[in-house]
């Protein structure tokens, strides 16, 4: 069995909880409050900037030239997606680039990105790869599932299409192939470290959608 399949089996309960989450169900049935989606989209833009940094750090540690290229291209791609959010969603919300950039990170967002950067900076390549993998893989699987159900809301349908696309699928498959190739030469302890990071950041994926639904804020004092 491919190692990535083992990884996925380890998060099946988390993924099932993600699909049941009211945020995602609200995207398909149109019941998600616009303010929750707006909050999520702004936090996602802030997340993508830090995710790009984590990808660049992972690329710097990659043992294969093709992976160095791949992760640096993906880092650039994450920043392009962040910019496209301004063009496709934030203008509709009346948000300027400055307004988004000056928005504080919500607690969950700060915790998630801090974890990613700590692993990407301080741990070996295989661990960094495992930590960033859920953001790719879970979004692709969620996108495909939500596209199957679709949405009557044009705005939410557009968001769903971004992550269900074959173009994004090709990106994810390349990262999965790298993870399997790396894991093949690792010790059981090294693979277990990959699994721990993969599970942790998968949990953060659930928490991120929950953060968006609740419009999570820091305490007021």
Region spans (language model):
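Short, charged/polar, low-complexity loop and linker segments
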Residues: 23-29, 116-118, 181-188
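Polytopic alpha-helical membrane-helix bundles and their juxtamembrane interface segments
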Residues: 156, 182-186, 221
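Acidic, carboxylate-rich catalytic segments that either coordinate divalent cations
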Residues: 194-221
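Structural helix-adjacent loops and short alpha-helical linkers that scaffold large soluble proteins
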Residues: 62-67, 187-188, 192-195, 220
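Alpha-helical bundle segments that constitute or directly flank the non-heme di-iron/ferroxidase center
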Residues: 12-17, 32-61, 80-81, 130-140, ...
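Acidic, low-complexity proline/glycine-rich segments
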Residues: 1-24, 166-177
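Active-site-proximal alpha-helical scaffolds that flank and shape metal-associated catalytic sites
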Residues: 66-170, 199, 203
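Long amphipathic all-alpha helical oligomerization modules
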Residues: 168-198
């Amino acid at each position: 069995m491919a190692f990535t399949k083992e990884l996925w089996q380890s998060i099946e309960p988390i993924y099932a909880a993600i699909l049941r989450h009211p945020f995602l169900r609200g995207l398909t049935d149109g019941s998600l409050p616009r303010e929750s989606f707006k909050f999520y989209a702004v936090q996602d833009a802030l997340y993508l900037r830090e995710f790009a940094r984590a990808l660049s750090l992972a690329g710097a540690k990659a043992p294969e030239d093709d992976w160095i290229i791949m992760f640096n291209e993906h880092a650039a791609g994450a920043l392009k997606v962040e910019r496209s959010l301004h063009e496709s969603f934030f203008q509709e919300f009346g948000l300027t680039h400055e307004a988004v950039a000056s928005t504080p990170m919500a607690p969950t967002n700060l915790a998630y990105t801090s974890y990613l950067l700590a692993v990407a900076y301080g741990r070996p390549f295989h661990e960094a790869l495992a930590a960033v993998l859920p953001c790719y893989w879970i979004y692709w699987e969620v996108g495909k599932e939500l596209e199957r159900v679709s949405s009557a809301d044009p705005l939410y349908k557009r968001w769903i299409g971004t992550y269900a696309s074959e173009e994004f699928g090709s990106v994810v498959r390349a990262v999965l192939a790298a993870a399997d190739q790396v894991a093949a030469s690792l010790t059981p302890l090294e693979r277990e470290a990959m699994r721990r990071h993969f599970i942790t950041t998968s949990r953060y994926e659930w928490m991120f959608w929950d953060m968006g639904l609740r419009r999570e804020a820091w305490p007021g004092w």
